[in-house]
Amino acid sequence: MPLGLIGEKVGMTRVLLKDGTAIPVTVIKFPVNYVVQVKSVNTKDGYNALQVGAYEAKEKHLTKPLIGHFKKHGVPLLRRLWEFRVDNPEEFKSGQELRVQDVFKPGDLVDVWGISKGRGFAGVMKRWDFAGFPRSHGHRYHRAVGAIGQRTDPGRVWKGKKMPGHYGAKPVRVQGLFVVASLPEENAILVKGSALPGHNKGIVVLLPAVERIAYRKSQKLKQKRLQFIVENLVKEESTEVAES
């Protein structure tokens, strides 16, 4: 897994191409990310990775072991930690600051991890997209789940059965999104579309897209289309975030 960054979903806006085409984008703003700990196969950890942290925290909100961990590596107290598997940990050191221009550039494909919007208790039609029952001929259960099992054998409801329950507020990873533009002065990037998980001001983690062999051809086509967008972007276009 390559190096990524911890950021915040800000909101949506749009950018214009030279031919006047409007491209909807989501703004992701990054605080300063710190390398907290460097792990390698040559240490007791036994594998190559970087522990990255962001968003400064108050001491009263952290446990004593975590406070000691931050002080040991000479970094500020941080609220969010994430570990990225890397091939070159020797190029980094504890306390090093990571910024968006060091990791992402326009034209990249990225994967975005976040917590989806919580929608509370929901029925099967909303939660699982069930069709429901007929609306006519005296049917009494229009939005019900229907049968949930068999008979004496197996005599139970199968684990994983799609039923009503809590909808959303779960980890989601959206793959293969486009980086349209980078804003180094704001430490932010613009990602094409609105597919990022979670609400505005929610924490997201961006990583370079994992190359999946089955989708290699479509990924290359995506990158060609994205390169056209990047080359034809109107640089002077305002990127003010829309209020939501």
Curated annotation (Swiss-Prot):
Q: How does it assemble?
A: Part of the 50S ribosomal subunit. Forms a cluster with proteins L14 and L19.
UniProt keyword GTP-binding, yes or no = no
Domain of life here? Bacteria
> Which GO terms label this protein's molecular function in UniProt?
rRNA binding; structural constituent of ribosome
Against PROSITE patterns, the record matches this protein to: RIBOSOMAL_L3 (PS00474)
Keywords for this entry? Ribonucleoprotein, Ribosomal protein, RNA-binding, rRNA-binding
Signal sequence interval, chain numbering: none
Q: Does the keyword Phosphoprotein apply?
A: no
One of its Pfam families is Ribosomal_L3
* Record function comment: One of the primary rRNA binding proteins, it binds directly near the 3'-end of the 23S rRNA, where it nucleates assembly of the 50S subunit.
One GO biological-process annotation of the entry reads:
translation
Q: Which family does it belong to?
A: Belongs to the universal ribosomal protein uL3 family.
NCBIfam families recorded: L3_bact
User: InterPro entries annotated for this entry?
Assistant: Ribosomal_uL3 (IPR000597), Ribosomal_uL3_bac/org-type (IPR019927), Ribosomal_uL3_CS (IPR019926), Transl_B-barrel_sf (IPR009000)
Name of the protein this chain belongs to: Large ribosomal subunit protein uL3
**Organism per entry:** Aquifex pyrophilus
Q: Which GO terms describe its cellular component?
A: cytosolic large ribosomal subunit
